[in-house]
Amino acid sequence: MMNNGCDEVSPRSEIALLGSVETMLEKIYEKHNHRLPISVETRRKLSSISEELALETLRKVFNKPYLKTLDGLIMYFVKGTVTVDGSPRLSPGESPVQSPRTPAKKSCRASQDVSLDLETPSPKFMKREENGGSKYIPPLLALGELEFKKAFLLLSYIGGESLVEEVISGDQIRKWKDLPMVSYEAAVWNRLGQRYCSPKERRRPLEGDSGMTHYYQCHVATDGSYKFKGHLLENTGTHLHKVLGDDNVLTVKFDKVLGVETYCNDLYSTYKGIAKNGIMVGLRRYRFFVFKDGGKEEKKKDVSTKGVKCYFIRTDSTASIDMQNPYIFAGKSMHEARMHFMHVNTLSSLPNYMSRFSLILSKTKTLEVDMTGITFEQIDDIHCHDQDDKDVLDKNGKPCIHSDGTGYISEDLARMCPVNIFKGKSMRSNNIQSKNLNFEGQGPCGQEPPLLIQFRIFYNGYAVKGTFLTNKKLPPRTVQVRPSMIKVYEDRTLSNLSTFNSLEVVTTSNPPRKARLSRNLVALLSYGGVPNDFFLNILRNTLEESKTIFYSERAAFKAAINYGDDQYTADMILVGIPLDEPYLKDRLSYLLKTERNALKAGRFPIDESYYIMGTVDPTGELKENEICVILHSGQISGDVLVYRNPGLHFGDIHVLKATYVKALEDYVGNAKFAVFFPQKGPRSLGDEIAGGDFDGDMYFISRNPKLLEHFKPSEPWVSSSKPSKIYCGRKPSELSEEELEEELFKMFLKARFCKRDVIGMAADCWLGIMDPFLTLGDESAKEKYERKKNILKLIDIYYDALDAPKKGAKVDLPPDLEIKNFPHYMERDPKRDFRSTSILGLIFDTVDSHNAEEPPPSEISKLWYFEDEPVPKSHMDKFTSWYENYRSEMSQAMMETDKVKRNQLTNEVIQRYKQDFYGAAGFEDSNKSLEELYPQALALYNVVYDYAIQEGVAKCTFAWNVAGPVLCKFYLKKTKDKSVVASTSVLKKLLG
């Protein structure tokens, strides 16, 4: 490189820049064919600002279509940025301010690589400067004095701009420092957000959002720049968030790189800078830590993310507010940090490394128990034996087991577990006190513990997942786990390393949901001999009853509990609110549309059918074709159909004998809601049913007499695919820490960008081939044979693809199995769709031709009890302003064009207002008395309905979304009607 001016020494050696900055300079030289290097003064300016600002400056230069003077343009962009001690950054290894745990290192990488060793300068190294005779504080340094929530909000409101004096001064930031969060947000929005963001990006906080998980988001562009979003609030949290704290976890989304479907190797070069240097959030650095592949849920996810979520965690910080408190991962590598969660270094392959580690991302509820006082026992799995009592081996040569994923927990520990948990969230109590609603969500004194608990355990380096069966025979404070449940073992060489020990509850065995059929299940039942009239009769009866939804409390209540996404509509009906109440009538109209869409897809209710969690029989008394089913009334007897979603094979529906097992009561007592499978036979019954196991899988159980009369079972599925390939790559323990991070990040990028949706494609092609197959007669034997052969191939591919993420396998869909024409009810392409005459096509057409008449909209009026009750003017004034703010926020959220994101934003707005109203996540968690809530709910109701009278019934929604439980209780109080206690599930049963 040529020298500049009369200097005899290369300016690069005199003024040292970070490797990432040098790399960006080289790119600029190459793109713009700039032969002369930048001047010493320009290098000095670049060295005087943070790495983040220097890179942002050079990106702006790089993106210019042409350059006149490179030095002049850089100096223009740098003007006003933070100066570091008024002098150039020292060369690597010479900084006087270093972390005692992480000495600065010299980078030995080639010039095109990006350095990851150098840290952001310490605040001690960033001083106030004289600026025209007055002192000022650099904005970035001032930001480091704010609590993280405030700092992140400010960064999100500058829309990706650099935090420089031209944007906002450090002194102004300090003036906002002590403002309450609501006032702070308003000030920052008025000064910055309105200028740099669109209205939909505003995040108006409410006081009292504590207790909810804050998800801080970052969006990374292909040029390496990034913008901050959020934060989003949720009632559920992950083990990762609970251990580190919400502000130390960053959810990161990467923009799609054009052409990566065919050039996946280009991905890492695009995002290498982020992988190496991490993401700077002010003066905090966050690095890649973990990602989770959606796997089985992938088809349901937002296609823009393909079900893959990526998380970075904070490593180090030079923010003054952070320097006051020690941070466990300061100066540690990501691999070292992971060891505090589980000893993933013991795993044999990289795919296993990340799939196991992602267990910390499950949405869970922590069991509040002292882990040091629990006895952990390892018991053997129950092996499958042949007629000679020898172990049966699977296609990979491993023993088949009956107990895959299930163990035991002592009764005292099970009683400590909260009931009615689903995916880490406390569901509303299933006990509805009709005419006297009881929403406390607590069972009666002495309530039985959950029969089954789906969980995650992190303990001394171990990671365990599966289900616990409550076992009254175990001594107190004891859990028993099997090898099939242990996903990560302890590394005894790390015995002195502290670990984040916890028992996390995912889901408990809850009262069964209203069972509905599905397209897959209808197709398999039809193949098994169930006549079309069986399905069509149920369908017609359901459609006829739906006609009375606006006039019959029975029909309205059934629709509310079957199709409502909350319980408030059902509550309104149960307390006697008239069906023509404007909001309730509008909700019933919505439920009618929801029901019709569900019926079109074959999702209609079926009598005497349930979805319940499965486990293995602890007594050993059940025979090969027997199961034990415990429902509300206890154990049932007789033949039942058993199926598991998303089964596609003809033999995925079994006919089994439900058997009473007296000895089981000695284990579980009176606990309810589970199905027990035998521990006898050459193959697990759970595995025979769509490859199921007992780590939380839900099984469809039906004792519907007409189904049992007609259905003829087929032979169960046996995989015909080849044995899994043996992993030949290097073990995680054989990689250097730098190599490990690079490989893990590449795995994430491939999962995020390069993977075809084989699961969804195989399922769609299966249905497209299966549909005509159902209508073929014996005269079409050859076509039936060919179609069945392809169906079986697709089933193998589908099941292999479901398990691929955790095995690191690659599954492809051969072109000869891909189809272009689909049945019309799938609504893919009207020009290509064929007219289906199968039961699925008949179901779709029957619903489509059924025009339910809806009554005309009612004039909006208030309920007399709510309008007549006096409400303090102070409450009316408060909620008038409150409602105006809500409408403003909701209109901004509705501007989002992406449906998934829009729903997320609108739900967040509603949740935050509920949090503010109750001082908690909802009514069930609130410590406020009803006497305090009644006048506030009535004020909100009257304010909202006054507005709705002018603007339409849709505006009524807010009052019920927020204050619905309180309004129902108040209405019941005013009617002075008698009440009875009833369970939702029992009401469903009584109503048919």
From Swiss-Prot:
Residue span of region Disordered: 88-113
Sorted UniProt keywords: Nucleotidyltransferase, RNA-binding, RNA-directed RNA polymerase, RNA-mediated gene silencing, Transferase
Catalysed transformations (reactions): RNA(n) + a ribonucleoside 5'-triphosphate = RNA(n+1) + diphosphate
GO molecular function: RNA binding; RNA-directed RNA polymerase activity
Any single biological process term in GO: regulatory ncRNA-mediated gene silencing
Top EC class, one word: transferase
E.C. number(s) listed in UniProt: 2.7.7.48
InterPro entries: RNA-dep_RNA_pol_euk-typ
Annotated TM spans: none
Protein family according to the UniProt entry: Belongs to the RdRP family.
Functional summary from the UniProt entry: Probably involved in the RNA silencing pathway and required for the generation of small interfering RNAs (siRNAs).
PANTHER family per the UniProt record, alphabetical: RNA-DEPENDENT RNA POLYMERASE (PTHR23079), RNA-DEPENDENT RNA POLYMERASE 3-RELATED (PTHR23079:SF56)
Name listed for the protein in its UniProt record: Probable RNA-dependent RNA polymerase 3
Species: Arabidopsis thaliana
